[in-house]
Swiss-Prot record:
Superkingdom classification of source: Eukaryota
Keywords, ordered alphabetically: Chloroplast, Plastid, Stress response
Residue ranges, annotated region (Disordered): 1-30
Cellular location(s): Plastid, Chloroplast
Keyword flag Plastid: yes
Cited InterPro entries: A-crystallin/Hsp20_dom, HSP20-like_chaperone, HSP21-like
Matching PROSITE patterns: SHSP
CC annotations in GO: chloroplast
Boundaries of every sHSP domain copy: 71-181
Annotated GO biological process: response to heat
Protein name, UniProt field: Small heat shock protein, chloroplastic
């Protein structure tokens, strides 16, 4: 029998004057420019952050490919992926152990905000009762390119994986010749 659960995640659009407040106990990851031109544009403020993130990804992937680390011989998948396609941007984020209720996706101005968290505590019986606790937390902010339909973002959580789809708009560039005096 198929599971027909509604796995879609609510997406909220928040404008500048309507921002909430939150207390966070861990440093926030800086925005990552997912524009295909961000890494090529030497004046892009996100260029250095993208280089840092790429370097971190390479280091992480290199440590995962040492002999004996990957016992099964299969590929190790990155915990997230972004595909910039012709008509949409598709994203995948691994969020193991989280349910739909644990995840919040919103758009704040030109930023896609993905938050999630889950706490669990388990008591073990006996005279010396110990409990085990687990906590997982996600807080990611991505700068969206100008050609996105920010009010049509869709998110779905399936088997611990968050899928986000952002439709693109057709941006027509207007060129105005300026006469030099």
């Amino acid at each position: 029998g198929g599971d027909n659960k509604d796995n879609s995640v609510e997406v909220q659009h928040v404008s500048k004057g309507d921002q909430g407040t939150a207390v966070e106990k861990k440093p926030r990851r800086t925005a990552m420019d997912i524009s295909p031109f961000g890494i090529l544009d030497p004046w892009s403020p996100m260029r250095s952050m993208r280089q840092i993130l790429d370097t971190m990804d390479r280091v992480f992937e290199d440590t995962m490919t040492f002999p004996g680390r990957n016992i099964g011989g299969g590929e190790i998948r990155a915990p997230w992926d972004i595909k910039d396609e012709e008509h949409e941007i598709r994203m995948r984020f691994d969020m193991p152990g989280l349910a739909k209720e644990d995840v919040k996706v919103s758009v704040e101005d030109d930023m896609l905000v993905i938050k999630g968290g889950h706490k669990s505590e388990q008591e073990h019986g006996g005279d010396d009762s110990w409990s085990s606790r687990t906590y997982s937390s996600y807080d990611t902010r991505l700068k969206l390119p100008d050609n996105c339909e920010k009010d049509k973002v869709k998110a779905e959580l399936k088997n611990g994986v968050l899928y986000i789809t952002i439709p693109k708009t057709k941006v027509e560039r207007k060129v105005i010749d300026v006469q030099v005096q």
